[in-house]
Amino acid sequence: MIYINNIEVMRGTNVLLSEASATIFPQKRVGLIGKNGCGKSTLFAILKNKLSLEQGSVTIPKNWLISSIEQETPGLEQTALDYIIDGDTRYRDLCKQLEDAEHSNDGNLLASIHEQLEHAGAYTIKSRAEALLFGLGFSKEEINQPTKNFSGGWRMRLNLAKALICPSDLLLLDEPTNHLDLDTVIWLEGWLKRYTGTLIIISHDRDFLDNICTHIIQIENKKLNSYTGNYSSFEKERAQRMALEQALFEKQQNQLNHMR
């Protein structure tokens, strides 16, 4: 469970969020929407503990692993496949521990690390990384090419795959469909529907939000407004809410006019 309680967020002298609260339940797929500059990416930074609050609190379970899309992809000699596998930091850490343990001649330690590697899916990580790359449109030949060979759009696909391969409890995706063709978007939708953690997506692609989201959080008037359902459900509920507010306002105005 993620609790966002009465937070205030500023960018310079500009207040982005004020007394804003929301609760996000585990295993939900949430679309985070709002006008450009309203604070969506800033909220992601807060969830990743990279930005402090003026007031309020954000509570995320301490044992949760968080994965997100990196914004930069350096041009490296490292192959695309190897770059993606780096996304599973637990696997890479265990490999380093195994390498160190092999010099210690400690049989118990080696057995423990091998057991942890098996639990971490070490024996399927290459096939899982390949499946992600193929799903995102890379060919069998391309996955073994250096990352420096790819254009900016394809490097963003690499970063997306790197975020997906990371075992996570909370997955934060900022505009994941940018640079993707329709077939790849459909593949990504299928993958995300099978994801068992909590998912929060920033996207301007309404069809994508419709197909993926179980909930919507809208940033409006510096508040976090929560809705159950996909984007289309949000639009209907918001329209109904605005109509009720308008009717109430008109009723109040009529009452004031009669009192004059």
Protein language model annotation of sequence segments:
Residues 1-251:
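ABC ATP-binding cassette signature C-motif
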Residues 250-260:
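Short cytosolic helices in intracellular loops of multi-pass membrane proteins
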